[in-house]
Structures are given as C-alpha cells and as structure tokens.
C-alpha cells in the first residue's frame, strides 16, 4: 500500500497558549451555541428520538444505526452537543448566590447605580479584578451609606436595605431598619422578598461602567448572567 513520505505531509504549526479567559455564558451565547431548543419532556416515539424532546438526535445519537444530523457521525464518533430550555421564570444559579447577595449590597435597589463615587475611588481601577471587587464591596456595603447618593453625586435618594439575607436554600430578602414614625403594620412591610425576577431587573440596569468598576466584565461576566434564564 502506498504511503506518503514525511516530506509530503504538511506540518501543522502549533499555537502557544498565553492565557485562559473564564466567563459566564450569557443567555444569548447559550442560545447561539445550542443545537436544539427542548420543548417536550418526551424521549421516544416508536423507538425514534422525539424532535425537541430530551433525547433530540441533534444533540448526538445513542443507538447503533442512527446518524447525528448535526455532524453526520454515528453514536461511536459524535462528541455530543447541548440543547437549551427557555425557562418560564428565571432562577438563581446556586453557585453564584453569595456573589449575587454582595452585588445587591453594592448597587441601589431602585435605580441600580453603584452606591459609591467612581471619581472619588478611581484608584481602584489600577487594582486587579478580584482585589478591586473586594475593595468596592467593602466601601459600598458600608453602614454609613443609608441612601443612594450619600457617597455619589447622582443618586436617586432611595433608602437602602440594611441587610440582604438568605432564608432556606435560595430565598433572598431585603431588610430595612425600623423607621421612626411608622406603625407596627407598616414596619412589617420593611422586609421585601427579592425574587429572581426582581434581582434580574436590578442587575440588567447596572451600567457597563459600574460593572467594570466593581471588577466584573461587561463582556465576560455581567451580573445579570448569574440569574439563569435559559
């Protein structure tokens, strides 16, 4: 059998890895990378995978004799692909819950602006991302900032929660201190449940400048991507 000589085989130039960028997948990126939207809980009908079901063949085939329509390979060679489900309501990614609670203490619960002045603390931009995040969180979560605008020029004046607390596995509440002059009935209203929908709305309003100043990235790790929508 004829074989190619070493001289005729082109040598592929290897690339040098200079870094790895970790990121949070945005909902749009998940949809773009997905090969199928899963809309049915069914798996098989007449021994064939249901299109749009949990075993949709576009995600790869499992049985001999079937060919994956995504890459044209059989069950032994296809690497498999992921699909996506459009959630009826958003939910928290449990692994980001602590960070979500910290971000809620850094931005206004009404207008989503950062609670500290970026101009007064612009030296933070010289810090590495993680160091900057810890620095900004320490400043923005200070008990001395009771209203949006106490430490910035363009705040909305909204009274900020004293605490962001978690109950159970992933239920968040904003808690305000008792305010003089309120009746006992009104004081009970000083606790507000922060549903994933509410948190998502707050995080979507955070500007890219504020996201960057906190040490996150508008391109790789926006806070609203920490709430699962897809």
Predicted regions and their residues:
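Conserved core architecture of multi-subunit DNA-directed RNA polymerases
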Residues: 1-230
């Amino acid at each position: 059998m004829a074989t190619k000589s070493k001289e005729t085989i082109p040598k592929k130039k290897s690339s040098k890895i200079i870094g790895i960028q970790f990121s949070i997948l945005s909902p749009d990126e998940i949809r773009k990378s997905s090969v199928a939207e899963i809309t049915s809980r069914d798996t098989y009908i007449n021994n064939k995978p249901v299109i749009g079901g949990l075993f949709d063949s576009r995600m790869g085939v499992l049985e001999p004799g079937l060919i994956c329509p995504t890459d044209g390979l059989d069950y032994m060679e296809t690497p498999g692909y992921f699909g996506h489900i459009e959630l009826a309501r958003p939910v928290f990614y449990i692994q980001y819950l602590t960070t979500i609670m910290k971000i809620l203490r850094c931005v206004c619960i009404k207008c989503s602006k950062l609670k500290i002045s970026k101009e007064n603390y612009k030296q933070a931009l010289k810090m590495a991302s993680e160091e900057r995040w810890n620095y900004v969180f320490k400043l923005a979560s200070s008990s001395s900032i009771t209203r949006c605008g106490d430490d910035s020029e363009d705040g909305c004046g909204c009274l900020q929660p004293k605490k962001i607390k978690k109950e159970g596995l992933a239920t968040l509440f904003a808690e305000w201190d008792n305010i003089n002059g309120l009746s006992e009935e009104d004081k009970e209203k000083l606790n507000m449940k922060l549903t994933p929908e509410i948190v998502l709305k707050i995080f979507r309003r955070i500007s890219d400048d504020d996201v960057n100043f906190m040490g996150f990235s508008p391109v790789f790790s926006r806070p609203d991507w920490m709430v699962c929508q897809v």
